[in-house]
Amino acid sequence: MKYMIASDIHGSSYYCQKLMDAYQQEKPDRLILLGDILYHGPRNDLPKDYAPKKVIEMLNSISDSMLCVRGNCDCEVDQMVLDFPCLADYSVLDINGLFIYCTHGHLKPVKLKPGSLLLCGHTHVPALENRDGIIYMNPGSVSIPKENSPHSYMILEDCVFTWKDLETLSQYRYKEFPKSK
């Protein structure tokens, strides 16, 4: 299966449309959203073309392919308008033997086993780090990137994670994991 992984749309219809365009081009089986979907939050400036209703319409059009976790800017009202579950604090995936813990990143995760992958957003900065044997990965932010990082998302296919620039769809980082036997 092919997965598209994104985080921190924050209600930007402009960048959500770019994500939808990339979704159409990439043709993933699933879109994993790591939270902060509709609201920009009190610490962020309004993103370009802040229009949560348009974001709702775009994401609901692909609701059958969505897997989503709650971000610190998401709430019960969001669930009333979205056609896919969006309020779980985390999701655990086993993909080709990779144990992947998906969360937004604003809450401390449960204790993970060495070799596990922690996939989260929240910081708006793409990341790939080994933290005490746990691989931490962040796709960056769709709409409000920080620290001069690009508007970005990730692709997971055949145990290879690829970070992509949302503006150019070009790859700028990748990490391959061995497939389980």
Predicted regions and their residues:
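Core catalytic region of metal-dependent phosphoesterases/phosphodiesterases
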Residues: K2-I95
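Conserved beta-sheet core of the metallophosphoesterase superfamily
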Residues: F84-L87, N96-D165, S170-Y172, F177
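Non-catalytic terminal accessory segments
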Residues: K179-K181
